[in-house]
Amino acid sequence: MNQVKLIALIFVFFLGSSFSRKNEAHDIHVSKCNIDFSNEEKTLQITMHIYLDDLEADIAKGGVTEKLHLLTEKEHADGDKFLLEYFQKKFRLQVNQKDVSYNFLGKEITEDLLGGWFYLEVENVQELKELKINYEILTDLYNDQQSVIKIKGSNKKKGYFLLNSKKKEANVTF
């Protein structure tokens, strides 16, 4: 039953984003995160899709008073610094029961201009046996925030999770 709900939520998310326009607000509060283990590169490659208005509102709620204008011509000079600080506070990982840090690789705007793709990477992951995710992105902003987490680990094993303001953690054993 949970898989049916997850598939329906993903469908609504993609359908809604394909008809969005720049000036329209969105009523659904969903972010998504893909985490892929690269055995060849010994890295975790992380891709997140987050709506920009929500992201900037949550960063401001955390105490940043400057308007960031992320992924626009007027982007704040320290936009990437504020993003990394936000991600470090709201997105934590443990690999094989050890806390890991990640590098912020970059960002790009989505086709509908409402969201952004954000790229992170954890280096020196020799083997992936266990992954613990703490994902609190936007969960303090909206009670109905949903986060779809897709993980591809060793031997192409996949895991799908739906996290929200009540359930912020997921554990996967490979």
Per-segment meaning from a language model:
Residues 23-174:
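N-terminal soluble domains immediately following signal/targeting peptides that reside
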